[in-house]
C-alpha cells in the first residue's frame, strides 16, 4: 500500500535488479495524470510522473501539482510506486519543487559552462538528498523541444560526465547527439 510519493532512485534500483523498465510520462493536467496512474495500477507497474516548468505553471504551480497527485494516489488507491519528477528544471524551479514536495528533480545545467554547472549541481544534490529526493543532472544538450525551447543535441564529453556524476547525482542525462 503506497499512497505516497516515492524516491525515483529506489524504484529504479528495484527495476534494474528485476530486469524491467520504469516509464516516465510527462503530465500537464488532471486527466492525463489520472489516466497514467490508473494504467500503472492496472499493470502493477511503478511510474515516474514528469512535470516541465511550463506544465507546472499551467497547472497552477508546483503546490497544486503535488496536491493533485497526492490526492489521486489516495482517492484512486494507487498501490504502485509513483515518483513526481521535475523535468529539465532551472535552479529556481528545482528549489521550488523541493519545497513543494516533489520526490525527484532534474537540474538541466547543460547550458552553463562546466564549472558553473558543477557548482549549481553540487548545491542541488546536497539540498535534494537532505530532503530525501532523487536528483538527475544533465551534461551536453539532449536534442528535442521542451516548453518551446529547441535543443539541437550534442555529444557530452565523457570526462565532463564523470565530473558531474561524481557529485552524487542519482541519474545522469548525457547528450549523445
Predicted features and spans:
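Short catalytic-loop micro-motif centered on adjacent basic/acidic residues
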Residues: 22-26, 84-85, 106
Amino acid at each position: 500500500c503506497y499512497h505516497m510519493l516515492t524516491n525515483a532512485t529506489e524504484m529504479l534500483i528495484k527495476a534494474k535488479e528485476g530486469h524491467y523498465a520504469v516509464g516516465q510520462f510527462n503530465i500537464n493536467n488532471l486527466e492525463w495524470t489520472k489516466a497514467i496512474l490508473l494504467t500503472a495500477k492496472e499493470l502493477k507497474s511503478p511510474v515516474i510522473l514528469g512535470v516541465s516548468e511550463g506544465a507546472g505553471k499551467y497547472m497552477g504551480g508546483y503546490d497544486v501539482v503535488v496536491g493533485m497527485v497526492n490526492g489521486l494516489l489516495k482517492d484512486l488507491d494507487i498501490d504502485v510506486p509513483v515518483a513526481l519528477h521535475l523535468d529539465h528544471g532551472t535552479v529556481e524551479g528545482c528549489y521550488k519543487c523541493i519545497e513543494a514536495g516533489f520526490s525527484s528533480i532534474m537540474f538541466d545545467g547543460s547550458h552553463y559552462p562546466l564549472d558553473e554547472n558543477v557548482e549549481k549541481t553540487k548545491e542541488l544534490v546536497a539540498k535534494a538528498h537532505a530532503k530525501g529526493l532523487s536528483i538527475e543532472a544533465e551534461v551536453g544538450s539532449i536534442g528535442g523541444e521542451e516548453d518551446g525551447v529547441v535543443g539541437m543535441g550534442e555529444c557530452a564529453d565523457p570526462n565532463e560526465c564523470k565530473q558531474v556524476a561524481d557529485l552524487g547525482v542519482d541519474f545522469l542525462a548525457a547528450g549523445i547527439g
